């Protein structure tokens, strides 16, 4: 599944909980960095990291360095950044973590399909 496909899946998961994020939000005042998903009121950004198993740009050399700089600058600006993989989107872990960060209760535990209390 391509990164954009994974982002579409995650966007649908968010919408199922009536969470409407800003997409490709430019967060830095001088750099062109963007977050895949942004919940501006909560200062929460979610990045779907593609290519984690195929040796994509984000997992090698200069791409990894650039991402580290981006996330450090986001932290300095007060953002919480949740980085998730495609597998975590598909398994439901990414939406679970997002909901918990927002203080919401997930419908089911993504690992066991049991209701979360």
What are these regions, as identified by a protein language model?
Residues 1-117:
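Nucleic-acid endo/exonuclease domains
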């Amino acid at each position: 599944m391509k990164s954009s496909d994974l982002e579409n899946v995650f966007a649908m998961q968010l919408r199922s909980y009536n969470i409407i994020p800003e997409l490709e939000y430019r967060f830095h005042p001088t750099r062109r960095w963007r977050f895949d998903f942004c919940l501006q009121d909560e200062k929460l950004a979610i990045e779907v990291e593609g290519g984690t198993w195929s040796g994509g740009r984000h997992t090698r050399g200069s791409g990894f360095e650039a991402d580290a700089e981006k996330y450090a600058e986001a932290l300095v600006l007060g953002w919480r950044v949740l980085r998730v993989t495609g597998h975590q989107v598909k398994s439901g872990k990414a939406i679970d973590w997002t909901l918990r960060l927002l203080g919401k209760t997930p419908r089911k535990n993504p690992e066991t399909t049991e209701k979360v209390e």
